[in-house]
Amino acid sequence: MGNPTMWFEVAGKDFPGLKGFYSQLFGWELTDMGEMPYATVDAKNGGIPGGIGQAPEGHPGHVTFYVQVDDIEAALSKAESLGGKRAMGPMDIPNGQIALFADPEGHEIGLMKMNQ
C-alpha cells in the first residue's frame, strides 16, 4: 500500500454552524482547539480522525483529506511535476507540518508529515 490517508478537514465561513451541523448529523464528538476556530473529530470508535474549522478570510472553504508523507517538499515538487499546483505551505503545526496542493483539475489535497 502507498501513503495512507490520515486526516480529513471541513473548513467554511460559519465555524459554529458547521460544528453544530456535523455534530448533530453524524453524532460526532468535537473538541475545540482553544482560541483557534477549529475542532477535532473524535475517532476513538474507528474511522479517520479530522477537523472542522473556520476558513481564512476571503477563502470560500474546502473539504479535503490529508495523506501522510515522509518529505512534504518532495511530495509538493512531485505533484507540481505531474501537473498539480502548490496551494499552501508547508506550514508548521503541533507535531509536524502540513501543505496543500491542487491536482490538475483544481481539487485541493493535503499532505501531512508528523514528527517522530
Locations of the language-model features?
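Mid-chain, well-packed structural core segment of small domains
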Residues: 59-87
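Conserved short beta-strand elements that form part of the metal-binding/catalytic scaffold
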Residues: 27-61, 108-113
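A generic "binding-loop/recognition-motif" signal
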Residues: 14, 37, 72
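Catalytic core of tubulin tyrosine ligase-like
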Residues: 22
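Vicinal oxygen chelate
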Residues: 6, 10, 76-77, 82-116
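N-terminal beta-strand motif that seeds the catalytic metal site of vicinal oxygen chelate
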Residues: 1-19, 46-47, 63-65, 113-116
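Conserved hydrophobic/aromatic beta-strand scaffold that supports enzyme active sites
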Residues: 40, 66, 98-100
